[in-house]
Structure formats: C-alpha cells, structure tokens
Amino acid sequence: MNQILLCSQILLLLFAVANCDGEHQLDSSMDLKSDSTKSAVLKNVAPKNDATQAEIAKDDVALKSGKKGDYVMDIDVCTMPLDDYPINNSKSRKNSSTLPSQILTDKPNQGSNQIALKALKHRLLMEQNNNLFLRNHSVSLMNEIEARKTDIIQARQLNIDLELELEALKRKLSEMNAQNARKPTKSCKKRPSKDIAPPANQLQEVIVKNTYRNKYLTLLTQLAQKINYEIANVNNPATDVPTGKSPSEGNPSTT
C-alpha cells in the first residue's frame, strides 16, 4: 500500500514537471517571436525536446519496475482524445489566450508533451482506481477479521460455559459417590436402658415424686371418708349417737 501511494505521488510530481516544461516552452516561443532582432534568424517553432522526454522516462519508477504486458506499457496513447482530462491551470489558460495564432497551431512542438501528459494522466487514473480497489479490499478484510474475532470470542464463551457445566457435573458425581460410600457403613448399636444406671440426682427426683404422690393419695382418701360421713349424718339425724370420736376420723367402713 505504501509503494502504491509513493508511485501516485511520483506520478503527480512528474505531471507537474511536464506541465511546467510545456508552459516554459510556450513562454520561450513568445519571447523569440517578440524579439525583433532574432526573428529573421530563429524559426517560429522550437525543435522537439527529446531530452525532456528521455529524462521523464529515466526518472519514472513505474516504467522501470513495470514488466512486459503491464497496463502501463500496453496503453495506446495515440488513440486517446486530446480534450480528455483538461488541465485546471489558470496561468496556462491566460498564457495560451495571449499567444499568437501561429504559435498555438504549432503542434509538432506540443505533440510529445501532450502525449506524455495524457499517458501520465491515464496512469494516475489507473493508480487511483487501483488504490480504491485495494482500499475496498482492505475494508472487506478488516470486516472479515472483526467477524472472525466475534466468532472466536463466542467460542471462548461457549468453552467457559461448558467448563462450568463440567465442574457442576463433577461436583454432583462426587456427592453421589459420597452418599454411596455412607450406605454400606453400619450404625453403632445403642446400649439398652436397663444396663445404664441412672444418675443420683435422677434417683432423688423419683423418690421425691413418689413421696408427694403418696401423701396426695392419703389426703384424698381422708377427704372422701369425711364427705361420706357428713352425708350420712345429714340423712339420719336421729340416729346420730356421739361415739366419742372426732368427725375428722371418719368411718373406715365407708370406703
């Protein structure tokens, strides 16, 4: 790409040099025509400047590096129209408008320069088209590279997801193996409660509970006897004979 841009710059430089050379030759013809002392000796038309064309061909890098069959060497410049690619140069137009009609019609002097200019213009156009093609091709390659990068990123993300899923499966498999390893193991048998002696405080608590339970049952029995005795006295008041016993003792036969 750098070599192509360099060739384009060289072609532009050669185009400018050839244009200046043509203007210089036209100005020289005007000076020779206006000089009255040399008008009888010199001709109106300057000789063909083959040295300039040889110098242009010598300094042209594209012609040196061009191979046989290249598009630069195969151009038929004689068939190209002369009004193609007009030169946008106001100075040359001004000078050409002031030239006499006799100098403007001297085509043998300008033929070689015009052919060289047309060839340079055509070559410049071809280089520009080639640059545009290469630029479009580079853009398409960059787009393809970006698409490949996107595919690579997606593939990496997919690999990461697969690795995470594989780790989860390994974890589940290890848990299942641990559960299978626990199943064959037998649990320790507990000793029967009869063989185990209760602690001292537990025994003391049992004794206290039994004592209070017995006292409660005794009081409940005495209360029942007293109630029965009082009911009997209410039903039979005439037969109430004092026995000398306290009412609280009750009748033992009424249980």
Swiss-Prot record:
Keywords: Behavior, Glycoprotein, Secreted, Signal
Stretches the record annotates as Disordered: 86-110, 177-197, 235-255
GO molecular function, one term: identical protein binding
Main location: secreted
Subcellular location: Secreted, Extracellular space
Biased composition (Polar residues): 87-110, 245-255
Signal peptide: 1-18
Tissue: Main cells of the accessory glands of males.
UniProt biased composition (Basic residues): 183-192
Residues linked to a glycan: N88, N95, N136
Post-translational note: It undergoes several cleavages as it is secreted and it is further processed in the recipient female.
One of the GO biological process terms: positive regulation of octopamine signaling pathway
Gene Ontology annotations for the cellular component aspect, listed alphabetically: extracellular region
Top-level taxon in the UniProt lineage: Eukaryota
Described function: This protein is transferred from male to female's hemolymph during mating, affecting egglaying and behavior after mating.
Protein name: Accessory gland-specific peptide 26Aa
Gene this protein is translated from: Acp26Aa
